[in-house]
């Protein structure tokens, strides 16, 4: 029997994915999904495998209507259902996009269309799809500043970069929006507001599927690879599954095939990629429980926190680590400190007379028992520091949840991120304790 295809593996996957037959509540009867299915059917989409449902933990997703086998098609969405830059250029916006200089980016074209169609309300041909899109998102760019301040430092920095990027995107697009005034009775400033563009940006950023790059003269040279895929984008992420997803040029459909088995009435998942929880939070606004790719990042400042300040070779050691790419992506994971983190610590812990052995350290060679033990001791101190910091943040979040009810959803999300990181740190502490016993 092939690995991962037996009964035990399926049971394990069900536990990890958190789905069961009794837990999903079918939502096919809801008016928004009835309208969406009519809309999709008119665009040649036929599907009997999946049904919209609400699941605890993951929220709205898609439930299997029948047993699904390995290699079976989960969903095949015709090109006529996809929202791409072709859709936008064929629309009333096409003439304005074509004549605007410099050419708008593919992302701006998609975002402009989403805002315009949402503003159109019941007059929009895309209304059934727009109705099921989230009204708000939980990416860091959408969070209140006081909530962003609670994020791990590395994620907070990326969140602030993300916010600056979206703000610049809005500022640089305002002249283009002004050119669209002839299309609207209302002032375009009230339609294409920052909040409206932020919603559209998050919609594309969190829900788009990847298409082969295309190039159009009327659009900028940025990669034109995004498409919104109605209904298909209800599939939630699990790091424990694998699928094959791509646009089929022969059938002109975006297709997803499963490499797993699904029982009837289980939630069907896809995998957005082997992302850690900080990446999932940043890009999609959620945290994955039991994520095997989850980790805790160690910054340069923390890396040297417990090293002797009297080490005259420290600057040189840091320079070597930087030159060889060992100053970034140093982590604690479910299995303990990463090889990269331990390697960096071993080099930093080299005694003066052993410093010339630094190349051997980077190659994974053992220099001495003393060096091995010292690096493990430092790793343990860093791990305990993180555990203490994480507990302090979780306590702060708990107090804020009591005091600021309006932010409870945002705070709960941040709390889940820190809770997962605490689990990882505790697992790493146990691993380090086991490794240290070899030197006692």
UniProtKB/Swiss-Prot annotation:
One of its GO terms (cellular component) is cytosol. Residues 48-273 form the SET domain. Gene3D superfamilies: Rubisco LSMT, substrate-binding domain, set domain protein methyltransferase, domain 1. InterPro entries: Rubisco_LSMT_subst-bd, Rubisco_LSMT_subst-bd_sf, SET_dom, SET_dom_sf, SET_MeTrfase, SETD3_SETD6_MTase, SETD4_SET. Residues 1-24 are annotated as: Disordered. One of its GO terms (molecular function) is histone H3K4 methyltransferase activity. Residues 1-16 have a biased composition (Basic residues). The keyword Ribosomal protein does not apply. It catalyses: L-lysyl(4)-[histone H3] + S-adenosyl-L-methionine = N(6)-methyl-L-lysyl(4)-[histone H3] + S-adenosyl-L-homocysteine + H(+); N(6)-methyl-L-lysyl(4)-[histone H3] + S-adenosyl-L-methionine = N(6),N(6)-dimethyl-L-lysyl(4)-[histone H3] + S-adenosyl-L-homocysteine + H(+); L-lysyl(20)-[histone H4] + S-adenosyl-L-methionine = N(6)-methyl-L-lysyl(20)-[histone H4] + S-adenosyl-L-homocysteine + H(+); N(6)-methyl-L-lysyl(20)-[histone H4] + S-adenosyl-L-methionine = N(6),N(6)-dimethyl-L-lysyl(20)-[histone H4] + S-adenosyl-L-homocysteine + H(+). Its EC number is 2.1.1.-, 2.1.1.364. Belongs to the class V-like SAM-binding methyltransferase superfamily. SETD4 family. PANTHER family: SET DOMAIN-CONTAINING PROTEIN 4, UNCHARACTERIZED PUTATIVE METHYLTRANSFERASE. This is SET domain-containing protein 4. It comes from Homo sapiens (Human).
